[in-house]
Design a protein with these regions (language model features):
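Metal-dependent nuclease catalytic cores that hydrolyze phosphodiester bonds in DNA/RNA
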Residues: 1-106, 113-126, 137, 158-167, ...
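Residue-level recognition of conserved beta-strand positions in structured domain cores
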Residues: 108-111, 150
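Metal-dependent nuclease catalytic regions and adjoining charged, substrate-binding loops involved
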Residues: 1-7, 135-283
C-alpha cells in the first residue's frame, strides 16, 4: 500500500499512517474474517498497487494512540498477545488488546462514533470478540466475558443533555458473556469463512463473488414524503408506486433518495479492481 500526501500534511502525520500491516500469505486475522471475501482477496493481490491518501487515514492515528496508551498501563493482564491457530490449510490469527487471566476477560479498546452506540450496532464487535475467545480457547486458556471499551470521538455534551437516546458520557462499555454455544457457532463460521477464502483465492478477480449487502454497508433507495421547510421526511416509502399513492398537500412533495453502498463508495481501498464496483460505474 502506498500512502500519498495530496494536501501536503506534516510528514509526521504521513509517517504515522504508513504503518498499516498486511496479512502474511496463508494467514487471516480476526478482523480480516469480518470483511467480505472479495475485499480480502483483492486487497491481498493488489496490496502494492493500492493508493491511500494520508488525509483519509487520520482516524487510524486515534485508534493506534488509544491502544498504545492502554498497553502501557501496568496491571495483571496480558497485553497485545498474539494467538494463531491452524484452520484448513491456513492460519487464523488475532492480537488481543488485553486478557485478564485471573478473571478470564478479554478487553478491547475502540474508538467509535456516537451513531454506533445509538444504533446499538455491535454485531461486528461481538463476532470479533468471539473469534478472539475461540483463539484463546484453542491455545489452552478460557474466556468468560468480552468487554469492549469505546471512546466516542464525536461525542457532544449538548446533545447528551438534550437527547434522550444520546450516550451521556464519551465512553461506552459493551460486554457479553461467552458461552459454549457461542464458541461452537463461531468455530463453524471461522472454518466456513477460511475455506471460502481459500477457494476465492483460486479465482480470477472478475470471478470473485461480490461482498454481501451487509459487508458493503448498503442502504436501499427510498422515496421520501417531504414538506417544504422541514428537513426530515414525514414518511419513507420503499417503492415509487407506494409513494405515488400519497395525497400531497400544497407544500408537500416526493423526494427520491437513491440507495448506496457506503463502504464501496467511500472506504474500500480495492474498489477499482472489484467486479461489482466496475459494473456499477459502467451503468
Amino acid at each position: 500500500m502506498k500512502v500519498t500526501n495530496i494536501y501536503n500534511l506534516p510528514q509526521a502525520l504521513v509517517d504515522a499512517v504508513t504503518t498499516e500491516k498486511h496479512n502474511k500469505d496463508g494467514e487471516y486475522s480476526a478482523t480480516t474474517l469480518l470483511k467480505g471475501e472479495c475485499e480480502t482477496i483483492l486487497t491481498k493481490r493488489h496490496w502494492n498497487e493500492i493508493l491511500v491518501d494520508a488525509s483519509e487515514s487520520i482516524w487510524q492515528i486515534f485508534g493506534t494512540a488509544t491502544h498504545a496508551i492502554f498497553e502501557a498501563q501496568k496491571d495483571n493482564t496480558f497485553k497485545e498477545e498474539f494467538f494463531s491457530v491452524d484452520v484448513s490449510n491456513s492460519k487464523v490469527t488475532g492480537r488481543v488488546d488485553s486478557y485478564d487471566l485471573e478473571n478470564e476477560i478479554i478487553v478491547d479498546w475502540k474508538t467509535a462514533s456516537v451513531r454506533k452506540v445509538i444504533k446499538q450496532n455491535f454485531a461486528d464487535w461481538k463476532r470479533q470478540g468471539l473469534i478472539y475467545s475461540w483463539l484463546i480457547k484453542k491455545c489452552g486458556l478460557n474466556v468468560k466475558k468480552c468487554r469492549f471499551i469505546a471512546l466516542l470521538k464525536d461525542h457532544s455534551k449538548a446533545d447528551a443533555r438534550n437527547k434522550a437516546d444520546y450516550p451521556k458520557q464519551p465512553v461506552y462499555v459493551y460486554e457479553f458473556d461467552v458461552t459454549a454455544e457461542d464458541l461452537a457457532e463461531i468455530e463453524t463460521f471461522i472454518e466456513a469463512r477460511v475455506k471460502a477464502l481459500e477457494f476465492a483465492d483460486t479465482l480470477k478477480d472478475e470471478e470473485l463473488t461480490p461482498c454481501s449487502k451487509e459487508e458493503r454497508w448498503t442502504t436501499p433507495e427510498k422515496w421520501a414524503h417531504m414538506k417544504e421547510g422541514r428537513k426530515s421526511a414525514i414518511k419513507l416509502y420503499d417503492s415509487e408506486e407506494e409513494a405515488a399513492k400519497v395525497e400531497l398537500k400544497k407544500d408537500e412533495y416526493i423526494e427520491h433518495r437513491p440507495g448506496e453502498n457506503k463502504k464501496c463508495d467511500n472506504y474500500c481501498n480495492c474498489r477499482e479492481w472489484c467486479p461489482l464496483f466496475k459494473k456499477e460505474v459502467e451503468c
